Amino acid sequence: MARKTLRARRFFSLIFPFFFMTSVYAEQTSVSAKTVTVEAKNETFSPQHPDQYQSWKATSEQSAREDALAEDPRLVILWAGYPFSRDYNKPRGHAYAVTDVRETLRTGAPKTAEEGPLPMACWSCKSPDVARLIQQEGEDGYFHGKWARGGPEIVNDLGCADCHNTASDDFAQGKPALTLSRPYAERAMEAIGKPFDKAGRFDQQSMVCGQCHVEYYFEGKNKAVKFPWDEGMKVENMEKYYDAIAFSDWTNSLSKTPMLKAQHPEYETWSAGIHGKNNVTCIDCHMPKVQNAEGKLYTDHKIGNPFDNFAQTCANCHTQDKASLQKVVAERKQAIHDLKIKVEDQLVHAHFEAKAAWDAGATDAEMKPILNDIRHAQWRWDLAIASHGIHMHAPEEGLRMLGSAMDKAADARTKLARLLATKGITHEIPLPDISTKEKAQKAIGLNMQQINAEKQDFLKTVVPQWEDQARKNGLLSQ
C-alpha cells in the first residue's frame, strides 16, 4: 500500500498512551478552582472511549515473565553492586507497570516512607498518578524523598492521562489531544530542537512515547529525572555528557569501575533507524488502526508486536510477505545477540581481571585509564541491549555500538594484561562458576534467600496498606 495510504490512516488515528510513567506518594492537596486535577483512574474514560479502553486493558494478557538474568547470567557480573544484579525481567504488558515495580527485588523492601534503596523518581514511568502528583506538588515536591513515599499515591497503571490531555475539550470531542505529561520530557525535547507544541502530528505521536522509552538519569540531590541529550542522542554524545559531569549510576563491586546503566532507549535508537528517519512512528507499528464490531476504526491500545497485526502495520508500507520479513528480522536479531554475547564475555573477564589488579596492589593512577575503557565499553553495550527492539528499530546502529564496545573492552584487557605482568601475574585470571543466575549471584556475594524473604514480607504487609490508603483517598475505584 502506498505511503500516502499510511498517512491517511494516521490522520484518523485516536492515539492513547504508548509509554508510561511514574508516580509519587504524597498527601492529596486541594487545587485552584481554575486548575483541573489530572484524572489518573483509567476506567473513568471507558464510557467515552470504550474501544481504546478495552484494548488498553487487554495488555493484561501479556502476562508472561521472562527472567533475563536466568537466560544470561553474565549480566549479574556486569551489574555487580547494582540492584539489577538481583532481578531483571524482560518487559511485559503495561497493565503490570505498578505491580512489577512493586514486586521487583530492585526496589527493596522498605517498611516506612523514608526507607529503601531507590528514590521517588523510580515511579516516573509507571502511572498517570505521576502527572497528577507533579501537578499538585510541583516537580521538586514530586521527586523529593524515597520510592516508598509514593506507594499509597501511585496506584493506577500506565494509561490515558500519561499521553492525553484528558481534561481538554478536544479529548471530550474524541480527538487525541496528545500531551507531554512529564515536564522533564518536554524540556528534553526542546533541548534537541523539538518543542512539542510546534511539532507535527506524527512527531508528537512518537514524542509521547519518548517520555518513557528513553535513556535517563537521576540528577542532583533530589534525584530528579533528566534525559542526557544536551550533547545529542547518539551513544557517544550521551557518553560525553555523562563524562563531563563525572556522573555514574554505581560502582561495580568487582572492578571498582564507576559505571553507567542504560535504561530503555527506544526513542533514541528508533530515531537512528530507517523508520525514525522516515517518520514511521511508534504508533504506526505498535498501535495500529483496527476496526471494531461495527466497522468503526480506532487505535488499538494493546501495544504489541507489529507482526501480530501484520496487515494493519508492516503491510501498509512493505510489499514482502510476513514470512519473508520475519526471516529478515530474525537474522538481524541473531546477529545482535551473537555480538552481544561476545562483548559480555570480554567484559566479564575485564571486571575480574581489574579485581585481580586491585588485589595485587594496583594504584588509582594505574587503574584510571583501564576503568575508563571498561566504563565506555559497558555503556555502549548496555545502550544497545537495553533497547530490546534495536534489531528492528536500528540494527546497523546496534551492531556499530556493540562493535565499539568490543574494541573498548579489548583495550581494557590489553592494558590489564600489561599491568598485571608488572605485578608478577602472567597467568590467566580464573573465573568463578557463573553458569547459572544463582551461581553468579553467589559469586558477587548476594544473599538471595534473605533478599527474597524480605521482599515477600514487604508484599504481604506494606503493599496492602498502600492500597487501603489509596482507596480511602479515592485514588482507586475499587
Curated annotation (Swiss-Prot):
Binding-site list for heme: C122, C125, K126
Class of the enzyme per the UniProt entry, highest EC level: oxidoreductase
List of residues binding heme c 4: C282, C285, H286, H393
Catalysed reactions, as listed in the record: 6 Fe(III)-[cytochrome c] + NH4(+) + 2 H2O = 6 Fe(II)-[cytochrome c] + nitrite + 8 H(+)
Iron as UniProt keyword: yes
Signal peptide interval: 1-26
Molecular-function annotations in GO: calcium ion binding; heme binding; iron ion binding; nitrite reductase (cytochrome, ammonia-forming) activity
Gene Ontology CC entries for this record: outer membrane-bounded periplasmic space
InterPro entries documented for this protein: Cyt_c552, Cyt_c_NO2Rdtase_formate-dep, Multihaem_cyt_sf
Binding site for heme c 5: H275, C314, C317, H318
One of the GO biological process terms: nitrate assimilation
Cofactor dependence: Ca(2+); heme c
EC number: 1.7.2.2
Positions that bind Ca(2+): E215, Y216, K261, Q263
Binding-site list for heme c 2: C160, C163, H164, H301
Keywords: Calcium, Electron transport, Heme, Iron, Metal-binding, Oxidoreductase, Periplasm, Signal, Transport
Gene3D superfamilies: Butyryl-CoA Dehydrogenase, subunit A, domain 3, Flavocytochrome C3, Chain A
Subcellular location: Periplasm
PANTHER family: CYTOCHROME C-552, CYTOCHROME C-552 RESPIRATORY NITRITE REDUCTASE
Function: Catalyzes the reduction of nitrite to ammonia, consuming six electrons in the process.
Protein name per its UniProtKB record: Cytochrome c-552
